[in-house]
Swiss-Prot record:
PANTHER family: RECOMBINATION PROTEIN RECR. NCBIfam families: recR. One of its GO terms (biological process) is DNA recombination. A zinc finger (C4-type) spans 58-73. The keyword ATP-binding does not apply. It comes from the Bacteria. Belongs to the RecR family. The keyword tRNA processing does not apply. This is Recombination protein RecR. Keywords: DNA damage, DNA recombination, DNA repair, Metal-binding, Zinc, Zinc-finger. PROSITE patterns: RECR, TOPRIM. It comes from Cytophaga hutchinsonii (strain ATCC 33406 / DSM 1761 / CIP 103989 / NBRC 15051 / NCIMB 9469 / D465). The gene is recR. It holds the Pfam family RecR_C. InterPro entries: DNA_Rcmb_RecR, Rcmb_RecR, Rcmb_RecR_Znf, TOPRIM_dom, TOPRIM_RecR.
Length: 205
């Protein structure tokens, strides 16, 4: 793609680095921004910079937050006895949109993947174990991981680590097809899968 302006080319190049955005889409976005009032472009830039500099991760559940503890962890309306384990913030948002879950979360930050050299130590699994040990209020862990090979491996690993503790370990029902990801499931299917969750069983059980 040949550009009549180096400035335009640089802007398109930077935006095309974002996931799922090719150069044609990036060009369309840049041209759209150029047509807007400068204040609107400045507002976008400031919002991104502000988010980058000030957003933090919840000290307890590791989801994105404006404060040390997120709004979900500090809410008196949430059932602190139930903790849903998810991969990242997108899964939290997907589950919240179902309006079917009222517990809290623990974001582990991915799944175990030997191919990508991601092991348990690279994830927020140790903090999950520590949370279960220290928080006697927790009665149930829901494995809200995507039904992929890596997701199942991670679920199995977590289950083995928590097996000796007096808590119920369940998994969202398999209304979600194998290989699918939670964030792409429709709200009705995902909500039903959470409501009809079942006990997680390993092959050794």
């Amino acid at each position: 793609m040949n550009f009549p302006s180096k400035l335009l080319e640089d802007a398109v190049l930077e935006i095309s680095k974002l996931p799922g955005i090719g150069k044609k889409t990036a060009l369309r976005l840049v041209l759209h921004l150029l047509k807007k009032e400068s204040k609107e472009s400045e507002s976008l830039a400031n919002a991104l910079l502000n988010a980058r500099e000030n957003i933090r991760y919840c000290k307890k559940c590791h989801t994105i937050s404006d404060h040390e503890l997120c709004a979900i962890c500090t809410s008196n309306k949430r059932d602190k006895r139930v903790v849903c384990i998810v991969e990242d913030i997108r899964d939290v948002l997907a589950i919240e949109n179902t309006n079917q879950y009222f517990g809290v979360y623990h974001v582990i930050g991915g799944v175990i993947s030997p191919m990508e050299r991601i092991g348990p130590d690279q994830l927020n699994i140790n903090s999950l174990i520590e949370r279960v040990i220290t928080d006697t209020e927790i009665k149930e862990i829901i494995l809200g991981l995507s039904p992929t090979m890596e997701g199942d491996t991670t679920a199995f690993f977590i289950t083995k680590k928590l097996k000796s503790y007096p808590i119920k370990i369940s998994t969202i029902a398999r209304g979600i097809p194998f290989g699918g990801e939670l964030e792409y499931m429709d709200e009705v299917t995902l909500g039903r899968s959470i409501a009809t969750r079942t006990l997680f069983e390993t092959k050794e059980d």
